[in-house]
Amino acid sequence: MSFGRLESQLRLKVFGRLQVIRQHLRMSNHTVKDGGCLLTKAGCAGVITLNRPKALNALNLGMIRQIYPQLKLWEEDPETYLVIIKGAGGKAFCAGGDIRAVTDAGKVGDRLAQDFFREEYILNNAIGTCKKPYVAVIDGITMGGGVGLSVHGHFRVASEKTLFAMPETAIGLFPDVGGGYFLPRLTGKLGLYLALTGFRLKGSDVQKAGIATHFVESEKLSSLEQDLVAMKSPSKENVADVLDSYQKKSYAAQDKPFVLAENMDKINSLFSGNTVEEIMENLKCDGSSFAMKQLQTLSTMSPTSLKITFRQLKEGASMSLQEVLTMEYRLSQACMNGHDFYEGVRAVLIDKDQKAKWKPESLEEVTEDYIDSCFTSLGSRDLKL
């Protein structure tokens, strides 16, 4: 072998070894920047920063594929004691899933329409079963997919800037990402009300509703994060103590009554119907301004979505999170194969004319046989957790 060739091979070996070392350093001590997330080790914590501020940190498949393996690594890492997830840009934690991309994929039969929901729900389950304390800082807009990244974790910290909603019935979908699990477990019929109407909760009301575990003023969140990552080998109880101490410093918003407090009796009675049609009839018969407003809101939603959502929460009330996510994957694929999801996205997100033409256009035309088919097992294509 010539000296030149030997020298060339040695250079390649050294270069290869350097690449491995660089990769290791990036993962162990530095921020991983590829894709829409920043994954950082800071003190005792693994920190996930959703980093698509121009898109309000909307969750796409690339981000899911970043977060899931890193979450699993941190879960097994003896030097990582908690996980913190937050959003960049100051406006949003995460405004939802990247629905436009999913819609485009579904129209042409692209696998993304399956992969996105499947991998998103697998991530939701990983968050719900995470062995390390998981702290979601939901400062800003938190909707749909953003709720899935937060609500199943141990701790959810809202601020005065938090805006929560599950608005899926307006786009021909349903409140997924485990909505069938956490929504029916809220007080009374609050979860069903939020699911059907897409009502938006703001600030401390997100905690009062039982969605956030803590409320901390936005200006204190940076200091809170510093105190969390500076802890030495913290337990879940230690993390809770720090969060509790910060909540005690945020008095003002907690003195206000819950935004829906004066209407909770009506919500519990009017939304206790055995069908969506019964709920609509209850609202008509009540005749109050509150009832009429809800009737008007529901009349703009996809009738198919309303019926799917009603059944989803009814079934989910007695299911495990894993069973709910399996059910919701079936529902996601039914929506991908239907009409209303594409029409809803067109009307709300693309053309923005807010004039969706639903098919069927009335609740009465949505048959129980069709709803049953949406919940049917996909066999070998079912989500397995």
From Swiss-Prot:
GO terms for biological process: valine catabolic process. It is found in: Mitochondrion. It catalyses: 3-hydroxy-2-methylpropanoyl-CoA + H2O = 3-hydroxy-2-methylpropanoate + CoA + H(+). Its EC number is 3.1.2.4. The keyword Chaperone does not apply. Keywords: Branched-chain amino acid catabolism, Hydrolase, Mitochondrion, Transit peptide. One of its GO terms (molecular function) is 3-hydroxyisobutyryl-CoA hydrolase activity. Pathway: Amino-acid degradation; L-valine degradation. Substrate binds at E120, G145, E168, D176. Disulfide bonds: none annotated. It comes from the Eukaryota. It is an enzyme of class 3 (hydrolase). One of its GO terms (cellular component) is mitochondrion. Pfam families: ECH_2. Belongs to the enoyl-CoA hydratase/isomerase family. Hydrolyzes 3-hydroxyisobutyryl-CoA (HIBYL-CoA), a saline catabolite. Has high activity toward isobutyryl-CoA. Could be an isobutyryl-CoA dehydrogenase that functions in valine catabolism. Also hydrolyzes 3-hydroxypropanoyl-CoA. This is 3-hydroxyisobutyryl-CoA hydrolase, mitochondrial. It comes from Xenopus laevis. The gene is hibch.
